[in-house]
């Protein structure tokens, strides 16, 4: 009896094994599936917590904190264009002057990366008042008799390229010089220039007060994200001054700045129009 049982059991095991090894027939060719792309997580930006310029609200180096800004007289005659360095100023004042012309006062809180600046022109009393409002070091080339009198009377820290020891006949030979390239095609009064590097290197050698006095506070305030608090959109502003000059300021939404005469974008500059009565 035992001999009959064993073959039966073995046959049953073989049958079960055969049934278990049979695979179902494929019903069709499976479609090729592309692997899902891996989406990299968006890195979180670290909020800037360093010093910002009190004149523009933009980041600046720690070495400029509490430093007096530099206010430079800039030529604005058509014959003197293009201007140099105005696009890197923190604040630009364009003020009507005599004869229907205007001149600009460019105020720089930080001079990092600022290249050639010019052409530098002469002082007038109303620009002195603007410079004093910022406790700025005033750089100019010449001036009216009234301006020279006010510089002495008001105690303006003024560096004069015409009647002072700040002019050189050679490039980078002093705080200011007459640009060799401009001298080839411009009148002499349109050739005085300086650079951010020259100002940085030479100001400490003049024995001037370079920092604001205790208690000084800048009167400008800026919203943290740069969003305007009110008003209408103004992509283009036209300011008629006289038969000679009409100021035009065009806003570039890509760079969030204006398009100045030298072809560079104004980055973060604050442009004030002051009508001198």
What would you call each of these model-derived segments?
Residues 6, 23-24, 83:
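Short N-terminal micro-motifs specific to bacterial/archaeal maturation
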Residues 16-18:
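C-terminal motif of bacterial Sec signal peptides marking the signal peptidase cleavage site
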Residues 20-28:
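Bacterial lipoprotein signal-peptidase II cleavage site
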Residues 28, 35-93, 98-277:
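A surface/extracellular/periplasmic glyco- and lipid-processing/surface-interacting theme
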């Amino acid at each position: 009896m035992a001999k009959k049982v064993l073959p039966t059991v073995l046959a049953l095991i073989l049958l079960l094994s055969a049934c278990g090894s049979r695979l179902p027939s494929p019903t069709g060719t499976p479609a090729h599936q592309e692997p899902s792309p891996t989406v990299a997580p968006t890195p979180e930006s670290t909020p800037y917590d360093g010093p910002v310029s009190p004149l523009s609200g933009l980041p600046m180096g720690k070495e400029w904190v509490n430093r007096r800004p530099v206010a430079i007289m800039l030529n604005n005659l058509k014959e003197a264009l293009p201007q140099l360095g105005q696009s890197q100023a923190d604040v630009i004042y364009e003020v009507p002057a005599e004869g229907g012309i205007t001149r600009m006062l460019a105020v720089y809180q930080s001079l990092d990366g600022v290249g050639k600046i010019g052409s530098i022109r002469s002082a007038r009393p109303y620009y002195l008042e603007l410079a004093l409002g910022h406790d700025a070091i005033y750089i100019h080339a010449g001036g009216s008799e009234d301006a020279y009198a006010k510089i002495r009377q008001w105690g303006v820290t003024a560096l004069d390229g015409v009647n002072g020891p700040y002019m050189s006949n050679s490039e980078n030979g002093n705080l200011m010089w007459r640009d060799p390239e401009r001298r080839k095609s411009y009148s002499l009064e349109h050739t005085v220039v300086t650079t951010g590097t020259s100002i940085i290197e030479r100001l400490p050698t003049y024995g001037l007060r370079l920092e604001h006095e205790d208690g000084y506070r800048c009167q400008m305030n800026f919203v943290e994200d740069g969003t305007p608090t009110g008003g209408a959109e103004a992509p283009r502003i036209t300011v008629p001054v006289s038969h000679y000059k009409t100021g035009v300021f065009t806003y570039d939404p890509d760079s969030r700045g204006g398009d100045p005469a030298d072809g560079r974008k104004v980055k973060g500059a604050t442009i004030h129009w002051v009508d001198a009565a």
